[in-house]
Amino acid sequence: MYITQMRIKNYRNFKDLFMTFHPLANYLVGENDIGKSSFLRLISFVTRARNVDEIEYDDPHQPIRIDLEVQLLEGAKEHFADTPDDHRRAIRVRLEMRVSDIVPRLYDLDTGEELPLETIRRLRYVSYSALSQEDAEVRPQVYRALERRLAQWEASHCGPIPQDERCYIQHEVNVGTFDSSYYECIFYLSRILCRSNRHRADNLKFISLAALRVITQIYQMANSLAVPLEHNIIVDKDGKRYLPLIISIDEPEIHLHPYMQRSILEYYQQLLRNEDASFCALLKDLFGLDGLRGQLFVVTHSTDSLIDDYRNIVRLYRDHQGQVKAACGSSFHVKREIEKHLIMHFPEVKEALYARSVILVEGETEFGCFQLFGQTVGVPFDYYGICLINARGESSIAKIKKLLEYFRLPVVALYDADVKEAHAKEKGVYFTQGICFEQDLAQTMLQKGKRQALDKIIDAACGTTGRTSSDMLKKACHKLQLDPQDFPPGPLYKAKAHNGAPLWVPYFAWLYSNKGVILGRLIGQSLEKQEVPPAFAKVIHEAGRLATV
């Protein structure tokens, strides 16, 4: 079971927000205070079929309307345990809340018929946030009951907890805020779920904690009279019983380092995909369940948490009217060949999902100097929210630009002028004045009378006096369609203009043959505002303008 799409009207800053979702995992990204955590809170209200507080209404005089499309069952022979004759695979409903109502009303979107709220309560929602203490909200009696059940199960499989571990549990009780049963549950689960690929204590501790949180919620559902568990259980054609769950995790980066963030999020997905055999066996023995079916929602401001697939991303952004909208990776329709490139390049552009505008450059030297150029020309990238991406070649710029534009990100791309004919009609594209970045730099520095400064940069980059070789000059002259015989090799500071040959060519030859991030940083640190080539400054200022729109 999973939510396929949702339309939200009049909830907080969501005047009219449409979203589509991936069936397995969805990562919500975007700027601060745009409504990502508010969305998770709304899911809680929807799945419990409860009204929100008056302060949650954008306009209290109008209702909040949430249109949902939910995939209930996977096949025509499946059914819910309490309605064996109902085989509806999907529903389209509207949940309508009014300030004056105690509970919301539920309608069938296709017929307009009012439905019982039990229909939407088939969705069960479990939320975790690093900023709140869900564990502390669970009554100690629940942990004690689980401790007894886990102890019986574990004793028949692994044996009792050793004395040294019991001493550690008592220490945690003395210094912590939980009953001893809470810590014993974690230790029991750590032994039950232990595998060869979970040898590190911290890995196992957090994985056990994740499992305990899920089991605790299922235990409370199983013992609840408000919504009987049978109302939620799906029975497949083979008689196997599955509990559908929607799990949300808010800001996992707060207490976890990057590797642990990814490990824990992947483990939650494994639980929802029933890939942990020990956990499935535990569900079977404790609750008579053969597994889970679920959907994961993650709100994060960390690129370390993000999955490397654009199809799992939901980016919230503001349109030109200031309204919150969503760009959903699951709804992008692209050809298979393009999709392959989008997935391949996505790891390089994850940080851009949090940006206000993006600059794409072709190579490493540009990448090394542009952020420093931004400081120099008065457009600091971090302050403006500008993301700089190295496309690692002209051919990748268009593909990365397309992906970013799918996510409604303003993009400025800088190409070398030698490919101008192929890209001149594209939107948001700029070109160097000379044939490439290195020519612009060499010409600008010499025109500004900064030859000595350029010599200093080159000498610092190579650790000795910069000089050109015959190979450098041949390569450069081939690019420029000049005769290398007009440019004898040697130290750059001795280079002279003769026979009408321009002086910037030897400098271009050296720069063209020594591209790299370190050189780029030296250039960025050394140039004054008036020395930044105009084509580069123009791109930076345009990115700054887009970031403030």
Put a short name on every predicted segment.
Residues 29, 38-87:
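Conserved P-loop NTP-binding catalytic core
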Residues 54-56, 74-159:
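Glycine-rich phosphate-binding loops of NTPases
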Residues 62-66, 88-93, 120-126, 243-244, ...:
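Short glycine-/polar-rich loops that comprise or flank the Walker A/P-loop
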Residues 345-360, 364-549:
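Acidic, Mg2+-coordinating catalytic modules of nucleic-acid enzymes
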